[in-house]
């Protein structure tokens, strides 16, 4: 029970039974195999539980459908390799100093957050900086971006000329949701919802001191959360491994096939 509580507290106090079970059985904690029913019983006894997600809301103005590229995803968010499909979206965070906005770019295959940015306005630079971070990371890793599909909603930030130029320079193909609802970009919306539940509105997390103060605090804590999400948080869609572990597996497989 002591180990289980420590794991829960060291991981933003967000693990429910499924993630706790996956974590205990994939990390070197010296506890051996732990049955799911045992995890459930002990968590109930300790009074600890996972967080509940809120449904994310759209915050960006939409470009007209006729001014957007085709929807190449059609709500099928699957990818067999890295850089096959990226999704991008923007969410908002209330602070005592006013609203701040957060942009993410995620690789669908590994679920890894490749780029992110926090800003005080919804200008194009918010989304563009997140995209450039993702592109730079792939270049450092020597992973080819040619032919990748970049999917987003119809937010005007993603239809800006500079954003299109950045995609063209890395030989990426733009895709935009066709109907304009949240299901058009469901995987990115799901990440926003996780971010809100596990960090922004999580009053149980260690270090919680009340409402967010300002952009600087959100930026600092978002950086820490993204690192944790990529390297420590088991993802059930990945079989209980982390996004970084999924990336490592794909990289190893690619090298063996070369």
Predicted regions and their residues:
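Charged DNA-binding/catalytic regions of mobile-element recombinases
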Residues: 1-258
């Amino acid at each position: 029970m002591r180990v289980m509580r420590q794991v829960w507290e060291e991981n933003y106090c967000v693990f429910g039974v499924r993630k706790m079970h996956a974590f205990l059985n994939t990390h070197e904690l010296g506890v051996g195999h732990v049955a799911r029913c045992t995890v459930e019983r002990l968590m109930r006894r300790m009074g600890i539980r996972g967080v509940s997600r809120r449904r994310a809301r759209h915050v960006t103005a939409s470009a007209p459908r006729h001014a957007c590229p085709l929807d190449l995803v059609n709500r099928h968010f699957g990818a067999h390799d890295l850089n096959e499909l990226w999704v991008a979206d923007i969410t908002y965070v209330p602070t005592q100093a006013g609203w701040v906005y957060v942009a993410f770019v995620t690789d669908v295959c590994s679920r890894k957050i490749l780029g992110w940015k926090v800003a005080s306005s919804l200008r194009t630079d918010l989304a563009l900086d997140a995209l450039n971070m993702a592109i730079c990371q792939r270049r450092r890793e020597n992973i080819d971006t040619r032919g990748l599909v970049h999917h987003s909603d119809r937010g005007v930030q993603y239809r800006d000329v500079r954003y299109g130029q950045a995609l063209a320079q890395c030989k990426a193909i733009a895709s935009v949701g066709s109907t304009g609802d949240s299901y058009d970009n469901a995987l990115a919306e799901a990440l926003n919802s996780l971010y809100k539940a596990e960090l922004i509105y999580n009053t149980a997390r260690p270090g919680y001191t009340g409402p967010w103060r300002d952009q600087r605090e959100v930026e600092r804590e978002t950086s820490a959360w993204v690192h944790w999400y990529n390297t420590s948080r088991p993802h059930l869609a990945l079989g209980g491994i982390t996004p970084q572990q999924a990336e490592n597996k794909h990289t190893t497989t690619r090298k063996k096939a070369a």
